[in-house]
């Protein structure tokens, strides 16, 4: 008897702004390739692997006909890639609406832990620039300690699942900057500060502070 099993599939979320809204800091061409190519690819990749996993669970595939480690590792990569990119789009705002400095509880925590926003920005930037290869620079709220923690994820295989309380995230894969900044990743990191959506970051933090 065939089991009636189906995993719900993922969908590509809409961009929260027009495709050219982050110019001149992040070009229209980069957003087009990044969103419609790479992010969409993670969604499609995850859904394809979920369909294969369905066949494994149902018993449609016999042992030796599939590589469970490969399926799960592929799901880890593609699902995290999808979720992290969704967060990345959300924490940027069009030119003129992003950048500057945070306010509210986020500013208070930054000042308490790092002394000033400028010092925090320096440490985050140095962290981003020190990342070997590809991955993400991340600011997350540690619900255990109450700290705003800066860390990096190499590739999409980070030690924590993507649902940790991420407040701010910077994509450092080459597809995020190479068309515009070539091999000058540090220039991209510096430009990114001009489109950071601090209002969105504050809302994310408030969600975790009130739990």
Swiss-Prot record:
Note the Gene3D superfamilies from the entry: Fe,Mn superoxide dismutase (SOD) domain, Iron/manganese superoxide dismutase, C-terminal domain
One Pfam family of this chain? Sod_Fe_C
Q: Return the EC number.
A: 1.15.1.1
**Keywords per UniProt:** Cytoplasm, Iron, Metal-binding, Oxidoreductase
| Major subcellular site | cytoplasm
- Listed cofactors: Fe cation
Entry's family note? Belongs to the iron/manganese superoxide dismutase family.
> What's the protein name?
Superoxide dismutase [Fe]
Q: Which organism is it from?
A: Saccharolobus solfataricus (strain ATCC 35092 / DSM 1617 / JCM 11322 / P2) (Sulfolobus solfataricus)
Top-down, what is the taxonomic lineage of the species of origin?
Archaea, Thermoproteota, Thermoprotei, Sulfolobales, Sulfolobaceae
Give the gene symbol: sod
């Amino acid at each position: 008897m065939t089991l009636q099993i189906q995993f719900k599939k993922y969908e590509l979320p809409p961009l929260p702004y027009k495709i050219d809204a982050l110019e001149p800091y992040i070009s229209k061409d980069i957003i087009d390739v990044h969103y419609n190519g790479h992010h969409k690819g993670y969604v499609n990749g995850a859904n394809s692997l979920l369909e294969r996993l369905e066949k494994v669970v149902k018993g449609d595939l016999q042992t030796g006909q599939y590589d469970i480690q490969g399926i799960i590792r592929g799901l880890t990569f593609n699902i995290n890639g999808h979720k992290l990119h969704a967060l990345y789009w959300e924490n940027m705002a069009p030119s003129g609406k992003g950048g500057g400095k945070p306010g509210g509880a986020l500013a208070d925590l930054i000042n308490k832990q790092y002394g000033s926003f400028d010092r925090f920005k320096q440490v985050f930037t140095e962290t981003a620039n020190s990342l070997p290869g590809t991955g993400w620079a991340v600011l997350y709220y540690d619900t255990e300690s109450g700290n705003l923690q800066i860390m990096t994820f190499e590739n999409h295989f980070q030690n924590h699942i993507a649902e940790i309380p991420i407040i701010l995230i910077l994509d450092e894969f080459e597809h995020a900057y190479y068309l515009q900044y070539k091999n000058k990743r540090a220039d991209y990191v510096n430009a990114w500060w001009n489109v950071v959506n601090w209002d969105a970051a504050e809302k994310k933090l408030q969600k975790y502070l009130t739990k």
